[in-house]
Amino acid sequence: MPSSPTRRAVLAACGAGTLAGCTSVLGGDSSSPDIECGPPGDKYAWPMAGYAADRTSQLSETDLPDADAEAVRLSQTNSVSGGLSSFSTPAVGDGTAYVAGDTKVAAYDLETGDERWGFDPDRGAQVPPALGCETLYVSTVEETLALSPEDGAVRWRTDAGTTRGGSPAVVGDTVYVNSGGVTALDAETGERRWNANPRGAGRGFAVADMIYECGLESVAALTHAGDDWWRATGVGEVYAAPAVADGTVYAATKNGKLVALDAADGSIRWREPIEVGVYATPAVGAGRVVVEAGNGDEAIAFDAETGEEQWRFETGLSTVAPTIVGDAVLVPGANTGFHLLDLETGERRRHWPIPHVGSQPVVAEGRILYRAFTVSDVFVLG
């Protein structure tokens, strides 16, 4: 059952307004940050994991490659000196794909495939990077860095690393990182505003009206000042960030449940069975919640409000998230490729029969980018 908000949290939620007054600051190398955050706009084709900070993986209608498009390797593992082995999906903006891996961070031209620049962060990155404030944010196991998207120059770096799943999220002038809990950093300077570590949390987070973090057996909500708001226990083991839409938090558990919680108080609205072995965030949009097949064979779509099952589609084994594109959803199968399905009916519109799909499909600039699980490189369709 969710715990009630504390008096301190209520006061914080009512009076915080912005994060500008949060001043629990530790060192961030900000001698010459050269970063100025403005309105987010629509500059980036795919700015962060889950497309947006709410992690819903929902895009408006956009072009997709033809069904006969061939997959071309973008990053190169051990085939050239200083190769990049990627454990994550890229961020995409201005015709460039930014990939973070175990040996370096690199920027690739989407048209030519040429590497524009590469940077060695000393310790590898195992989560996707994020774009915002005209800056690329990368979390390694030890620190978070702000890099110039143009040349990879370091603008600041600070000791708030990501030790387990959960990609950085940029919201306004704040970068949120998963460092055993949630840490809020000033996007312009790298200064630490606050750190919160809800009991049992740390598997991934989403940012909306509050910050929602999943962990073992629980989902927790924090205010934008870092104070505890509620914690729902007994949810089940969740190994990925939740998705947040229309006042509801959606979390998929490893043991085969999709749970919808009230974003305001953590009460459970509905709970429905899914395949076991789901390790990714649900995709949410247009009244549907779609989860991958996990260790089973079928992706499943639910009514977002009631939890009623709407359709199933056989993809085979898949442990990576779908992506919603307009009135369709791009559902991955590890060995069957990408299936573009009608979001309302589940009927297949298009199919890319590619093998070894190891990540969520990133839809950007008329292309589909993904990581292959066999070589840990990023490939491009289109």
Feature map (PLM): residue ranges:
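Hydrophobic/aromatic beta-strand positions that recur at structurally equivalent sites within the blades
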Residues: 49, 108, 147-148, 185-186, ...
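Cysteine-rich, disulfide-stabilized extracellular repeat modules
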Residues: 42, 113-115, 132, 152-154, ...
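Membrane-interface anchoring determinants
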Residues: 78-81, 100, 108, 147
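N-terminal secretory signal peptides and thylakoid transit peptides that target proteins
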Residues: 1-18
